[in-house]
């Protein structure tokens, strides 16, 4: 939805406040340092509980999320106090396991509900860890979190593997093998390659020859897509829809995609439509009817396109998700299924049932609420700003300081009163649930052979967070979102696939603001020191004969060359951390 904003305000919000200068860079740097420290805090907790066995009582996923969010808020209290109007959590801590691609951040009072809703699932379910709330050996765990200071945002996602260990031997006996290893390796290599490619925009003369455009030396969206797709193909993986490499600006970090049409959107996104385009480009069948669906209601600058150049002084979010195709015996579509908590319908045995834990405020909607609890809750939500939030963040006992059971029980008590008010708020679209999404594989022959009477006229009202111009998943075939959802439930060939994900935030600093006095890429989050890749072994490798792969190898060499290569700097986590003792764990 387009908001009525004057040209003067638009100039201030989108241009003036995003000029990279010392004050802005310091806010980015501080938020990145807090995010890096929070990521290390969560990974250390998981290692202490599941690998080193230092904590006697295991911590559940909901407990880890609450503790990480509390850690971020406690850290933010130490910086820019009384100096900025807004600071806080930009992305609630999400711990997605295996096939859950994004959005898994359950509240502490939902642990038993999730078990009850999924009582027909067993240990063989791909969602067993998410349902029980505890991680298991072999799980591919994606940790996502972020914070902001005055709207300048840093986000991170890191994939780690849970290895089998015991008290006598805390080191894993071997690396992760198989299709999951392919996805983990591909996500790490792609993230590092795109980071190096963005760094080449600062010194275009260092851009590898095989990656150069015919007319210009600048880094474009087409090059970014080519590099990522080449790595995915080499590791027999698919880029999961929702992956993106996009520019972020003050208060515009991708959290409101689909709610507000962002002017001058700049980034590469991967959707089902790109898989459809590849299918039609490689097919020899001539009797497939394709449509020309164009959304004329949305400004063209708000629709993502690869036709852009990366410029100095911009901030980019690199968010890439991969799933392996080893178990897929024929061509198919990788799509995302939104999880819901409707218990009145018939569910398949291994279908996940859960309710969203995070919400986004839609300021374009207005409604006079009837319930007093809903009005009071909306007042608290409006103070939170434009970023996603959880109900636990609104509790008077949040953030937790000692991580005790008493603090957790106090948060649970507040949640009970909040849920009634949130029902009226969401029913009137004042807030939108952040969806929990699961990666699914659907065979193409099932899609092409299906009847589609309504074509693209059907509309999925539940798909609230959809990018402008991508409301129809398969526009050429005329397959709408609601039709694709029905196709996933109408065949037993549909498969659930594990997902690996890496996300980092980078700044392209010019010589006027860089520490070294020359252009450099400043990596706010991620990196080899804080987000060290897990021990995996993939049987696949990049093909050196491919010109794009040669460019990827050149990017890796430039990243390692400290003298003549690319100038890149990483934000380091804070040295002081919170150590969780076994006697201070929350018992729920």
Curated annotation (Swiss-Prot):
It comes from Candida glabrata (strain ATCC 2001 / BCRC 20586 / JCM 3761 / NBRC 0622 / NRRL Y-65 / CBS 138). It is an enzyme of class 3 (hydrolase). Belongs to the peptidase M24 family. This is Probable metalloprotease ARX1. It is found in: Cytoplasm; Nucleus. The keyword Nucleus applies. It comes from the Eukaryota. Its EC number is 3.-.-.-. Keywords: Cytoplasm, Hydrolase, Metal-binding, Metalloprotease, Nucleus, Protease. Gene3D superfamilies: Creatinase/methionine aminopeptidase superfamily (3.90.230.10), Winged helix-like DNA-binding domain superfamily/Winged helix DNA-binding domain (1.10.10.10).
